[in-house]
């Protein structure tokens, strides 16, 4: 498994790589620049895994506020960022139900629907985690989904969890099997939105946009449409400012 996973990941990254680099890094850098211009204060970005590293970036800032771009809190993401912070550094723990974040998500989906029409089914896919110890995370994911559905005035939607690996039980239902089941039951066109990812990345572009789409089509579906993440949408940059100032 250890021999195969790096090669498999490299192949997947090749499918979504841009001339500017990793989509996640590109979008995050742009968000930081736009927020800096909007707030007229120093704004820097860092990566939990990779460069620029969190600790090295913190050394360049006075009285920093850290905003992990994980809307829903979990021990495996947000908490690991907190573990790296020196004493006294402030951090936003979560923003899964922040009105500006929900409004940005809703505006993003509406913009896509205005341009491309609305699919017959709406599926909200969040990053999965092992089920044990993830009660808070799951609750916040489902709360985000409910608030987004309310903002969109959608009565029927599905919540699923992706990115599972290994043999332990993860949060259910799983995204790809759910899509196959939908296709087998006659669903022809499904819209997928990933509210837990604020930037398009490997998990959205490849895992949903390529692999899950293929699984859906192979099972008899006609069209799986991936709604882009928030990326550099003006509503999201505004939401980031409101989250930071709260």
Question: What positions do the PLM features span?
Answer:
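Active-site-proximal alpha-helix that buttresses catalytic centers in soluble enzyme cores
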Residues: 1-246
